[in-house]
Amino acid sequence: MTSPFRSFVFKMRFDKQAITSVSRDQQVERVHRYLSALGGLHPLLGKWYLQGSSLQEALKTEVVAEAKNLERAAATGFDTEYPTWLSLSLWNGQEDPLQGGLAFNYYAHDMPSISSIDFEDAGALVSALDDPGALLVEMLRLTVTMWPEVDWGVIAPNKYYLDGQVFSDRQTIGWIGFCPHTLKPSDFPDAKELIDIPERGTIMVNFEQVMDERNRDHFRIVGTHDTKLVELGYLPMFNN
């Protein structure tokens, strides 16, 4: 029997002041390099298309092989009233989320809402892959390495991210998360793995299996680690 689809958040938050100091052209070029590099991680991430009015139209605007499509989308979306705003929405060409259908959203700005890179819905990768955690870690590692402006990253069930956190006004480390500080195993003994990212911080993997917010051990471990991060002064407010 096929397991029901479960929605997951995969959000990498920008420091707004830092990302808006990067020129639009540099950001677009970096997005293109990033999408190209994702293809080396898994075939599901090998092609990315602009959103279109129909499936046929969308499939005409692949951006990895045709960087000009990405550049045109960025130019079309420019608004003189909001010069720091850069928004790009792409899709990996898979229609069925259960087979890995995924969107990539890029929101760089200094507005009141969160500025971030998102994969929507990351539950698609959880559903489609036998070992999604390994790929998600590599996607997160690639992101924080390529974007020094990312100041937090989290992968967690959507229900937990929106309603289940211990600190409703703060971020969470989730199932897999990035903290821009060096974390010590002695402070997080229940974490499955702490991955040092030189000159950037630490990726924390809390457990090998996919996080289930209904699992009491999962809930306890993430809550305990979020509490420790608050004690260390490392768990940021929900928005910056």
What is the meaning of each model-derived region?
Residues 39, 62, 76-77, 131, ...:
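Short, flexible coil/linker elements and helix-boundary hinge sites characteristic
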Residues 114-174:
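Short helix-loop boundary/capping segments
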Residues 95-113, 165-168:
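Acidic, serine/threonine- and glycine-rich low-complexity intrinsically disordered segments
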Residues 1-49, 156-240:
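C-terminal interaction module
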Residues 89-91, 103-105, 118-120, 176-178, ...:
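Residues in well-ordered beta-strands of folded domains
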Residues 4-14, 107-126, 201-203:
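Glycine-rich, often proline-containing surface loops adjacent to acidic residues and nearby aromatics
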Residues 26-101:
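N-terminal low-complexity, intrinsically disordered segments
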Residues 70-76, 107-109, 128, 159-162:
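Short low-complexity stretches enriched in small and charged residues
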